[in-house]
C-alpha cells in the first residue's frame, strides 16, 4: 500500500471516530435533558414557604456579642499573663 493511501485511510478513520463520539455526546445531552424534564414534570420541587421574621430580633449582632468577646479576652488575659 502506498503511504498516501494509508494516510487517507487514517484520516477517514479519525473523522469517523470523532463523528461517532460527537453523535453519542449529542445523544447523551438530549437524553439527560429529557430525563430532567420528565423528573421535573412528575416530581416538581415544592414551593418554599416564606419564613416569618422573629418577633424580638436584636438590631445589632455586635451588641449581643460584645459581652461574650469581652469575657473571652478577659479569660485569655487571665490565663496567659
Swiss-Prot record:
Catalytic activity: oxaloacetate + 2 Na(+)(in) + H(+) = pyruvate + 2 Na(+)(out) + CO2
Keyword field: Cell membrane, Ion transport, Membrane, Sodium, Sodium transport, Translocase, Transmembrane, Transmembrane helix, Transport
Domain of life: Bacteria
Keyword Ion transport: yes
EC number: 7.2.4.2
A single Gene Ontology CC term: plasma membrane
Membrane protein topology class: Single-pass membrane protein
A family per Pfam: OAD_gamma
Transmembrane segments: 12-32
Top enzyme category: translocase
GO terms for biological process, alphabetical: sodium ion export across plasma membrane
Record GO terms (molecular function): decarboxylation-driven active transmembrane transporter activity; oxaloacetate decarboxylase activity; sodium ion transmembrane transporter activity
Cofactor: Na(+)
Localization: Cell membrane
Assembly: Heterotrimer of an alpha, a beta and a gamma subunit.
Family: Belongs to the OadG family.
Role description: Catalyzes the decarboxylation of oxaloacetate coupled to Na(+) translocation.
Protein's name in the database: Oxaloacetate decarboxylase gamma chain 3
Organism: Salmonella typhimurium (strain LT2 / SGSC1412 / ATCC 700720)
Gene: oadG3
Amino acid at each position: 500500500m502506498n503511504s498516501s493511501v494509508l494516510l487517507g485511510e487514517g484520516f477517514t478513520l479519525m473523522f469517523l471516530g470523532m463523528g461517532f463520539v460527537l453523535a453519542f455526546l449529542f445523544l447523551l445531552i438530549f437524553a439527560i435533558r429529557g430525563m430532567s424534564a420528565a423528573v421535573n414534570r412528575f416530581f416538581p420541587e415544592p414551593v418554599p414557604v416564606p419564613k416569618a421574621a422573629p418577633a424580638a430580633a436584636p438590631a445589632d449582632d455586635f451588641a449581643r456579642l460584645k459581652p461574650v468577646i469581652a469575657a473571652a479576652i478577659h479569660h485569655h488575659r487571665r490565663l496567659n499573663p
